[in-house]
Amino acid sequence: MQQDKVNLLGLNQKAIEDFFISIGEKKFHARQVFKWIHKKGVIDFDAMTDLGKNLRHKLKEKAQITIPKVVFSKASKDGTHKWLIDVGGSAVETVFIPEEGRGTLCVSSQVGCTLNCSFCSTGKQGFNRNLSAAEVIAQLWIAARTLSKTDGEHDFTVTNIVMMGMGEPLMNFENVVPAMDIMMDDLAYGLSRRKVTLSTSGVVPRIYDLLEQSGVSLAVSLHAPNDMLRNEIVPINKKYNIDELLEACKLYAQNGPHKHITFEYTLMEEVNDNLSDAEELVALLKSREVPAKINLIPFNPYPGTPYKKPSNNRIHRFKEFLQHNGFVTTVRKTRGDDIDAACGQLAGDVMDKTNRKQRYLKKLGDTNAN
């Protein structure tokens, strides 16, 4: 029986070195190939000109570099770019957001999501599977290779990564961490820990593991100032409550790259956007002594949701109260809404688990017909 070829795309530097040793080759050859793949974007062994002919032949027998197919891509009028990527018959989305002086890539970690937060469109798809490390890093590989550096108006260089796409990254820890290792490797994309941010809904044990094994920047999807409300809208809170979550956050802030935690708070009208909610949030964070920045996210409605986006006045009032009480507070701009790329819309054309494959196949058929 022929052994399956190893996909080198998802191997971090140590793993690819171990693979080369296992086939009787030297570590420095592994580093050469690693650099070819990620720094230069080359996936054809024959094009790796500093490798000997015998080594290239051996690699073709024992390894492969497989990039997922891009089903389609869309560019927004504001410069935002979205890709729908085929991951073995299912699809995930990746979004690039250009801003002045930076370009942020929002990366998915799962097909669907297990956590079923009540306001999240991705959660309504149900959960299919975790992405492999290769499928995670492929999103950056594709973006880095297909974006032009500039169109005269927008800068299209990826400078920051946010693990905030489809899925809960800490529920796919074993694949997400090696992929982030590649993102931060100087032989690959060379991003610093400050430039790679993982967002979690609060898988508390894995927050401690993340600090020990990776130490990237941490963002926490809080969305509520008390357990009663958070139990309702972020169900994982029933397993790991706010006290446990903030205890982990405090330790992470003390040892992480930013010395603070970014708390994401999706504002939903008359659900969690009242002044009393802001007061409770301030009291909560001050009492737990967690160094915090707060990122307010106006809710983006999607078909079938009972929630509404607050008025600008309510958003401004909430922000002003937090700032007045000493918290650095930002309001996330709505970006890419004309291509369904804004936060909360990452389900896009693959809205629910039942119809995901049919929708994907239809999109693939439409693409091939053009």
UniProtKB/Swiss-Prot annotation:
Class of the enzyme per the UniProt entry, highest EC level: transferase
Miscellaneous comment as given in the Swiss-Prot or TrEMBL entry: Reaction proceeds by a ping-pong mechanism involving intermediate methylation of a conserved cysteine residue.
Gene that specifies this protein: rlmN
CDD domains in the cross-refs: Radical_SAM
Protein name: Dual-specificity RNA methyltransferase RlmN
Function field: Specifically methylates position 2 of adenine 2503 in 23S rRNA and position 2 of adenine 37 in tRNAs. m2A2503 modification seems to play a crucial role in the proofreading step occurring at the peptidyl transferase center and thus would serve to optimize ribosomal fidelity.
Source organism of this protein record: Francisella tularensis subsp. mediasiatica (strain FSC147)
Gene Ontology biological-process annotations: rRNA base methylation; tRNA methylation
Catalysed reaction, written as an equation: adenosine(2503) in 23S rRNA + 2 reduced [2Fe-2S]-[ferredoxin] + 2 S-adenosyl-L-methionine = 2-methyladenosine(2503) in 23S rRNA + 5'-deoxyadenosine + L-methionine + 2 oxidized [2Fe-2S]-[ferredoxin] + S-adenosyl-L-homocysteine; adenosine(37) in tRNA + 2 reduced [2Fe-2S]-[ferredoxin] + 2 S-adenosyl-L-methionine = 2-methyladenosine(37) in tRNA + 5'-deoxyadenosine + L-methionine + 2 oxidized [2Fe-2S]-[ferredoxin] + S-adenosyl-L-homocysteine
Record has Calcium as a keyword: no
Positions annotated as active site in the UniProt record: 93 (proton acceptor), 343 (s-methylcysteine intermediate)
Lineage of the organism: Bacteria, Pseudomonadati, Pseudomonadota, Gammaproteobacteria, Thiotrichales
